[in-house]
């Protein structure tokens, strides 16, 4: 549960409590599809059953709050990653002025300096060398993503 920010956990608690009509501290796994749809995720029955089986570890047919958070966090974290990739794609496009699918290592150097004004020239050189392993002097979007996300 530690990968979600407290405000998201509070939001999930409100949603959970709304579905926990009998105030038993758990909700029926039958509600999972409805909840995921409210979060903007429509899943087919097979996928839904697979997720429920994974999350309802004790097979009770009910989800305790921790199980519910575990389920919801998969979707929330995924969306955050997608949103971040979209933002990085936009940023890359801004720097790729010619629209040719890459930026120069000099441009990347400027971006990295803007993000971290304490970075040394040596660190920058090492990073650029690692990223531009073929020595082409250019960085494509995938390489840019790798630098920005560390993945």
UniProtKB/Swiss-Prot annotation:
SMART domains given in the database record: EFh
Amino-acid positions noted as binding Ca(2+) 2 in the UniProt annotation, renumbered to this chain: 132, 134, 136, 138, 143
Domain (EF-hand): residue spans on this chain: 7-42, 43-78, 83-118, 119-151
UniProt xrefs under SUPFAM superfamilies: EF-hand
A GO term for molecular function: calcium ion binding
Sites where the protein binds Ca(2+) 1: 56, 58, 60, 62, 67
PROSITE patterns: EF_HAND_1, EF_HAND_2
Stored PANTHER family: CALMODULIN LIKE 3, MYOSIN LIGHT CHAIN 1, 3
Family, as annotated: Belongs to the troponin C family.
Function noted in UniProt: Troponin is the central regulatory protein of striated muscle contraction. It consists of three components: Troponin-I (Tn-I) which is the inhibitor of actomyosin ATPase, Troponin-T (Tn-T) which contains the binding site for tropomyosin and Troponin-C (Tn-C). The binding of calcium to Tn-C abolishes the inhibitory action of Tn on actin filaments.
Name under which the protein is recorded: Troponin C, isoallergen Bla g 6.0101
Species this protein is from: Blattella germanica
């Amino acid at each position: 549960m530690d990968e979600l920010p407290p405000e998201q956990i509070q939001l999930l608690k409100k949603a959970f409590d709304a579905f926990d009509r009998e105030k038993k501290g758990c909700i029926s796994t039958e509600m999972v599809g409805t909840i995921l749809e409210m979060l903007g995720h429509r899943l087919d029955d097979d996928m839904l059953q697979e997720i429920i089986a994974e999350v309802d570890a004790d097979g009770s047919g009910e989800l305790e709050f921790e199980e519910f958070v575990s389920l919801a966090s998969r979707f929330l974290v995924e969306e955050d990653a997608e949103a971040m990739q979209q933002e990085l794609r936009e940023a890359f496009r801004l720097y790729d002025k010619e629209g040719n699918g890459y930026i120069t290592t000099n441009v990347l150097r400027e971006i990295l300096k803007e993000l971290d004004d304490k970075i040394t020239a040596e660190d920058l050189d090492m990073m650029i060398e690692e990223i531009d392993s073929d020595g082409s002097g250019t960085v494509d979007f995938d390489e840019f993503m790798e630098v920005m996300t560390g993945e």
